[in-house]
């Protein structure tokens, strides 16, 4: 029997209309039986919305004058009996958003739930909302609806007035109602939607300006529902991007035993709910860790089917071990804070952190999540603290199971917020609310001060960290919102040497502040208009002398029809480079992810990804291209003003039909014409500086002349 999981990926992989029609007919067999029963469940309980101050939350972190961390939690017990024969209730907070209105992903997951093995030992209970249209005829986008899914049947239980799925009250009411009406030995909660990481949270409601549940609002929701939830939830899961962070785990400790979440972005099709139900039918006495491992394995297997596993991640975290991890982290960051009192050491630390595995893009082309791997950060800075091994062991104890793809080797299961680019005032405020260590906040504060003052720490107050924890007035930290001049100074300005290479030299005192150097290439379309062709690493750097030389040989990426592409380097290691390419794909703006492999010199399109929006909403789907898809290159256009290039607009190339034969994107010699080349110098604070451009020409034989 072909499962919904396989079919939904086949629908994505096959584009020939007659075959799609046949598959659509086959899919009718999997539409679940639907009935309406508005009398079998109780109405919402009346939740207290009068909680304020510390009472509105279940976790409170405080710090003493010596910087030691105190964690106060309103912990629930796990020993209250449930008078029920049901082993598991899985509550699903299904905030459909554009994932449903554009692709029907939420409906497909409901179908997956209905297709799972029939059993009275478990039940799915779903609240729907958050989207402007549903891909079925039994759910309305004008209201909140509640469903039960069991033994192959969907039962519509309640229809309520429209509510914002991005508000704490909405989640709290569903949680309290679900637990009261569907008691079980174990209850799990899945938050289904887009994820925006530790800053922006989860569950963006398409009908309410994409409002989302921040981590603070999640804590509020659980705290409001707490009087009606006798025991801890066995797990809280995020079928969403970017939510497996230490900040998220800290919020969930009082409310659940386990967390299941991804450090990286997820495929739009996410978890395999048929596999989850099948496992619960066979092993109803499983605990959260055992079910969490199954969720991870089935998610990864589904990603493999659709060829989206290369950067997939999913982790199961034991929340009872988080406090020990946080205590050891605070000691580690205390050492790090003490070690970075001078600009040189701070620069060394920042440069090390910049090399740590990060998640969700984190580049100027696609947007920033500012999430890096927690274990990777601690490992990279082990020389600065005697507690690094303790932290890594505690982290290993927390993450009881994880799966990750080839391109995310080395991920340790939990991320942490880190300013890969300067925070704005909103991000700063949220960081203050969710940061898990006063000394880590102090380190970030010192880093922000240095960023605003050109790397200089003169005048920095070592006592300022107490403001973050003991005072709501943050006016003294205005420098968080500033960016100073780059600390990278040149002892020799760019010039053409006798061999025709473009060169410059970094001042020896600035080398520690230099993260990396790329090149930028632009193409002259006529005498004054140029297209930006992107960035690459055609640069040789001598980190001892500071000498930098161009390594450009006239090679660039293009479509098979010869159109150069705007390719922006977003990830590099010893084995491959990954580029982001702005295009219209079937008429929709997105970014192609293109990988160049060094061992065999091959280039392939990994998929398309829509990037990170300004509100932190991360596209869930890195989706595969299919033969027959149309690609139109997009270029940023500039006007040559003589001594600078002035941005004018963007321009489109011509339509290209994707073949899928492995030769759609090629690395080859640029077409004959005039171009310009510049160095881009990135410092450790995330700032970039462009050198002067030098004009070069490519002749009909592919030779480059400056």
Feature locations, PLM:
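N-terminal Sec-pathway targeting helices
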Residues: 1-19
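Sec-dependent signal peptide cleavage junction
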Residues: 24-41
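Terminal, contiguous helix-loop blocks that mediate binding/assembly
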Residues: 37-83, 197, 203-238, 243-706
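N-terminal extension/subdomain marker
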Residues: 38-183
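Structural recognition of the beta-strand scaffold that forms the well-ordered cores
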Residues: 89-94, 123-128, 187-191, 234-238, ...
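Residue-level signal for short, function-critical loop segments
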Residues: 96-97, 130, 193-195, 420-422
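Catalytic-core segments of thiol-dependent peptidases
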Residues: 128-231, 240-241, 246, 263-264
